A protein has these predicted regions:
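Bacterial signal peptide processing site
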Residues: 26-28
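Blade/loop signatures of beta-propeller domains
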Residues: 39-64, 163
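Short loop/turn segments that connect beta-strands within beta-propeller blades
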Residues: 106-110, 169-173, 213-217, 277-281, ...
Length: 376
């Protein structure tokens, strides 16, 4: 592979990380809103799931029967429905939208259709209410066009855009706004009992985790340490949470963090994985690896965490998947591709893993959704 192509793919991988983890979600009094159905999007890959041993790299012993579900554009953050039959994910394809939108697809690759309204940028889709509704974040209330890219003269930074959290039926109808405070409200996921959302917000001047009821009421702050807390998920029994965190370690780090935050930016180059009780008590650091460790998700056994990391080359964009015990022991590398693998999620029964990867791209920089049968 030429250096120019590799550089292009690495830049695209960075762009996926940038857009995929940014979303909108916050909680105060819910504001109801009704929108027209976006209707299904024509998708050339619908029903074309690829299955091949060539999708498995040497060393990927936990994977069997890997299937590629999308075949163009940038696709990321695919999350299972509670019955394991569907996925919701964000997708940006030039022929369909200038910005990431939310799509649903069956796990066999059929039935791809858009469920967001096609405006603004969306992120962090999740099923709830027995898979009859979805929750996701969007910037469309602030502006229907794509948000401007961040100021990279500041280095590699993520923008903390004007995202709010919404719910809708799985066909995109009955859109309801849950948050409305002008802050960054995003990265929302659901408790196993379906009653609480956990999300990231800047509403109180820092980037913290909060929970709220699924109707937007009873907002409670979960984290209180200065720094970036985000991308949280509940454990299978709902008693714990796992998230990524980047905490300033020096006075200079804190000053840089606060300066960027004032401009609605954050630098994600150093993040580690943390766990705590669901109310935020007894927080504990799981990883101490350096680099960017993010996108953690509990294994269904509740004792292990899968996540993405570039700790073997912190200045690079080659992220791989890793598995680690909640006690910080037993680190194991899962993927061995030479580009980008991230955003892993286990199916509810633990038999499948879905993730986003640059592997098998038809053109440089494509990121697609893959699903594998999981082998212990």
């Amino acid at each position: 592979m030429s250096s120019s192509i590799r550089a292009s793919r690495q830049r695209a991988a960075a762009a996926v990380v940038l857009t995929a983890v940014l979303a909108g979600c916050a909680g105060s009094a819910p504001a109801a809103q009704t929108a027209q159905s976006p209707g299904p999007a024509a998708a050339s890959e619908s029903g074309r799931a690829a299955e091949s041993a060539s999708l498995i790299r040497p060393g990927e012993r936990h994977f069997s029967e890997v299937r590629q579900l999308t075949f163009e554009g940038n696709n990321a953050e695919a999350y299972f429905s509670s019955d394991g039959t569907r996925l919701i994910f964000q997708r940006q394809v030039d022929t369909e939208s200038d910005c990431d939108q939310q799509y649903i697809i069956n796990v066999d690759g059929t039935g791809l259709h858009r469920v967001s309204n096609g405006q603004g940028r969306t992120s962090c889709g999740y099923f709830y209410d027995d898979d009859r509704r979805i929750v996701y974040s969007s910037t469309h209330e602030h502006a229907p066009s794509c948000p401007a890219p961040p100021d990279h003269s500041q280095g590699y930074v993520w923008p903390l855009g004007h995202f709010e959290i919404y719910t809708a039926n799985t066909d995109g109808t009955d859109l309801r706004q849950l948050t409305d405070n002008g802050a960054y409200n995003a990265e929302a996921t659901l408790s196993p009992d379906g009653k609480r959302l956990i999300f990231t917000s800047t509403r109180n001047g820092d980037i913290e985790l909060y929970t709220m009821n699924v109707d937007g009421s009873d907002v409670r702050r979960v984290t209180k340490r200065v720094g970036y807390d985000g991308g949280a998920f509940f454990s299978p029994d709902g008693s714990r949470i796992v998230w990524r965190a980047g905490y300033p370690e020096t006075a200079a780090d804190t000053a840089d963090y606060q300066r960027l935050l004032a401009g609605r930016l954050v630098r994600p180059s150093r993040m580690e994985i943390w766990v705590a009780n669901a109310d935020g008590s007894e927080p504990r650091q799981v990883t101490d690896m350096g680099g960017a460790n993010f996108a953690p998700f509990f294994h269904p056994d509740g004792e292990r965490i899968v996540f993405a990391s570039n700790h073997e080359n912190p200045r690079g964009r080659n992220f791989d998947l890793y598995l680690i015990g909640v006690d910080g022991n037993g680190l194991e590398r899962i993927t061995y591709d030479d580009d980008f693998d991230a955003f892993p999620m286990f199916s509810p029964d633990g038999k499948r893993l879905v993730w986003a990867s640059n592997r098998n791209a038809a053109s440089p920089g494509e990121t697609n959704i893959f699903i594998a049968d999981w082998v212990e």
